[in-house]
């Protein structure tokens, strides 16, 4: 059995020589960035939490990408995940009265041929929430169904976002319910045509 302290030390040692740790999932990046320091408080400094970031955050804030060579001639609806919005700052949360921004949309706007929409209640949870979906499967599924319907109401062919867990949750529900919409990670769109 590996303790959390031992686990973190493995991660710290593995990534100590890197400037950044880039994660393809906002919820995973948020866990290491926000929760590792709290879990490990008083045991040792969590070096990984200072280096990790979501791929959208890395492309937008560090690399400052200003051109994407790919093409994606489809209509998409952007899924703003809870962790991405509220813990990583990938977009402005609706409950705060600040100037609206969305790093996901900033990047997608560089893709040739794409049409971008956001659903009504754009930053409301899809119902996954990790253990929540296991402990409250009926509520989780209903929240996912409602979120998918709002994405579909935009006329989108695809739902996209930076959080793999949200996309997998909604894709599973859509498949089971035979809902005519597809799911694709934002990086797949940014890399389309490469």
Regions found by a protein language model. Name each.
Residues 139-155:
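A short, acidic, amphipathic alpha-helical segment used as a generic capping/interface helix at domain edges
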Residues 1-6, 11:
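Single conserved hydrophobic/aromatic residue that forms the stacking wall/gate
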Residues 88-114:
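Anionic-ligand binding region
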Residues 24-51:
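Glycine/small-residue-rich loop that forms an oxyanion/phosphate-binding "nest" at active or ligand-binding sites
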Residues 23-31, 79-90, 121-136, 157-172:
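Local cysteine-cluster metal-coordination motifs and their immediate loop/turn environment
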Residues 46-67, 177-194:
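Short, flexible loop segments at boundaries between secondary-structure elements
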């Amino acid at each position: 059995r590996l303790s959390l302290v031992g686990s973190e030390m493995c991660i710290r040692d593995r990534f100590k020589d890197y400037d950044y740790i880039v994660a393809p999932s906002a919820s995973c990046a948020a866990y290491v960035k926000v929760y590792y320091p709290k879990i490990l408080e008083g045991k040792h400094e969590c070096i990984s939490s200072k280096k990790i970031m979501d791929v959208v955050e890395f492309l937008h804030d560090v690399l400052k990408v200003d051109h994407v060579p790919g093409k994606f001639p489809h209509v998409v609806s952007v899924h703003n995940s809870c962790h991405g919005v509220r813990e990583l700052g990938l977009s402005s949360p609706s409950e705060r009265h600040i100037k609206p921004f969305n790093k996901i949309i900033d990047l997608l706007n560089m893709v040739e041929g794409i049409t971008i929409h956001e659903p009504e209640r754009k930053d409301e949870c899809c119902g996954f929430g990790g253990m929540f979906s296991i402990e409250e499967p009926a509520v989780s599924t209903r929240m996912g169904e409602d979120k998918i319907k709002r994405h579909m109401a935009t006329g989108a062919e695809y739902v996209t976002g930076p959080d793999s867990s949200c996309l997998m949750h909604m894709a599973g529900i859509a498949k089971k319910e035979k809902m005519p919409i597809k799911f694709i990670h934002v990086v797949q769109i940014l890399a389309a045509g490469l």
